[in-house]
């Protein structure tokens, strides 16, 4: 049995509109230590990340602590948007209501989901018994959750929109999905099962 710990990046500086280069804020850098404290004793063998700076920097302290190099995987990057969006909530709701909707030169959620889930399952095939960490993003990670639990939609996404950093643990056995759990490091590492019958995150 292997556990995949997805780590949604810590708070980033939204004054920087470049998706690739946007850094963590000072608070984000401090909060990354909470990720390290939680994961450093989880027998982690591999650390992967989206190539975006904010995702890499969120797991960098953990990688240094465990002396594990971070492998960047392009497929784990955040949804591509053609330009900066001021009314993110309206745009996000429209995308969650229609997985095929996108702006010109942007990605729809179906595309984001396919590339993220494909990359995830390739890692599961490569390391079936290993515990791995993956530096990720809010929307990208949420589409992965939706793949395994279709009840996770816009309402659930809205609940975690401001939760940065955030850990989602996905357990596999013999390449088969077993369960998902949400870990809130700001609430004494509170663990909430993400059930297949419903999204518990909606009802909290």
Residue ranges and their predicted role:
Residues 12, 140-141:
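Short active-site segment of divalent metal-dependent hydrolases/proteases
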Residues 41-43, 123-130:
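Glycine-rich phosphate-binding loop signature in dinucleotide/nucleotide-binding domains
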Residues 49-50, 114, 135-136:
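Short beta-strand scaffold positions
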Residues 64-118:
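Phosphate-handling substructures
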């Amino acid at each position: 049995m292997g556990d995949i710990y997805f780590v949604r990046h810590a708070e980033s500086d939204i004054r920087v509109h470049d998706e690739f280069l946007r850094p963590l804020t000072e608070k984000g850098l401090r909060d990354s230590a909470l990720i390290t404290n939680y994961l450093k004793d989880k027998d982690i063998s591999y650390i992967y990340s989206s190539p975006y700076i904010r995702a890499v920097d969120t797991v960098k302290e953990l990688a240094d602590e465990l002396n594990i190099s971070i492998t960047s995987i392009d497929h784990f990057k955040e949804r591509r948007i053609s330009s900066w969006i001021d009314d993110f909530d309206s745009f996000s709701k429209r995308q969650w209501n229609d997985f095929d909707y996108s702006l010109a030169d942007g990605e729809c959620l179906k595309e984001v989901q396919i590339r993220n889930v494909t990359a995830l399952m390739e890692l599961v095939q490569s390391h079936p018994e290993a515990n791995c960490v993956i530096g990720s993003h809010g929307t990208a990670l949420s589409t992965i959750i939706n793949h395994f639990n279709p009840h996770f939609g816009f309402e659930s996404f809205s609940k975690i929109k401001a939760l940065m950093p955030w850990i989602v643990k996905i357990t596999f056995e013999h390449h088969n999905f077993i369960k998902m759990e949400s870990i809130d490091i700001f609430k004494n590492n509170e663990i909430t099962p993400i059930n297949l019958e419903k999204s518990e995150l909606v009802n909290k």
